[in-house]
Curated annotation (Swiss-Prot):
Pfam families: Ala_racemase_C, Ala_racemase_N. Catalyzes the interconversion of L-alanine and D-alanine. May also act on other amino acids. HAMAP family: Ala_racemase. The active site is at 37 (proton acceptor), 269 (proton acceptor). This is Alanine racemase. Belongs to the alanine racemase family. The lineage of its organism: Bacteria, Pseudomonadati, Thermodesulfobacteriota, Desulfuromonadia, Geobacterales.
Amino acid sequence: MDSRPTVVEIDLAALRHNFSLVQKRVPEGCGLLAVVKADAYGHGFQYVSEELEKLGVDAFAVAFLAEGVQLRMSGITRPVLILGGIYPGEERRCIGLNISTALFSLEQAAALDQAALEIKCYRKAHIHLKVDTGMGRLGVPYHEVPEFLAKLKQFKNLELEGIFSHFASADELDPEGIAFTKLQAERFNAAVEEARRQGYAPTYVHVANSAAILTQDLPYCNLARPGIILYGALPSGDFEGQVPSQPVMRLKSRVAMLKWVEPGTSISYGRRYVAAERALIASVPVGYADGYCRSLTNKGEALIRGQRAKVAGTVCMDWIMLDVTNVKGVAVGDDVTLLGPDPMGDCISAEEMAEKAGTIPYEVLCGIATRRVRRVYLG
């Protein structure tokens, strides 16, 4: 049994709360395609997906086929979409498990069409046409959509189940970001209209990510793709205070050692922290190998007995040190909240940690190394 005190708590009650918030944000009749890629943003795909399926989520989105297979093997029966498409040789398994895939090349289309013909499962390959409206990553360029759709008709074993795109800057609420999101929405709407003009009838039309769910009115869409908002974090600082979501993840540990150090004493690698006065230092068994960013050196904060304590010195692979001089009553064995809500009421949000680490909340959540850190599910 792993007795190491560094654990991640996943609050399923908070997940349910956030799901309800998203349901209220989208228009009536708009379904939810929950994004559970990257092990549900570090929260554990199996428990999260099972909980969302109980809540009535319409479908799940993953990054690649292996993640979709994991969902199916864990008993998930709702539709699954591979956002990043599949690779050569994966066609048969994708079709056999009734998993839908993004499509953005005729070579992909030909391979899927042939696989559907050969496996004789009397099931067409379900595809979602990915349109590049300005992200510049994956997708058929928006101006090439008419020609692509015309050529796609030659493949009789494909079903255009959906059409989608992805916003590049929906989380940027400055005039430039807003204008580009509007331009992408217009390009996407034109692509949808072109598909219908050519006789396609996609079941699902979707473009709204978490940021767009909070800001955009997209009446031509009937599916939304909430990701980070489900996990209680915000797409960017521009959304602070706009939605009462609840953090689902709490990373916690315990004080392993306390010691007083004299003025001039250096702490950790590189001697980046030197005590200016007599200080009480707590050693806590968590480090960058667990996903606690090394860039939080001398910047990060933790909560002990409801009080904040700053990281003192370089974050190590397995340890951090905290200056707890002003934490009243601190003792060996005390709980330490490193990320997420503390039982005493304060919270180290993913946004706060990301800002101090010079990154984004997505990386903070996905970076928690659950191969080393146990997950405990609550609620």
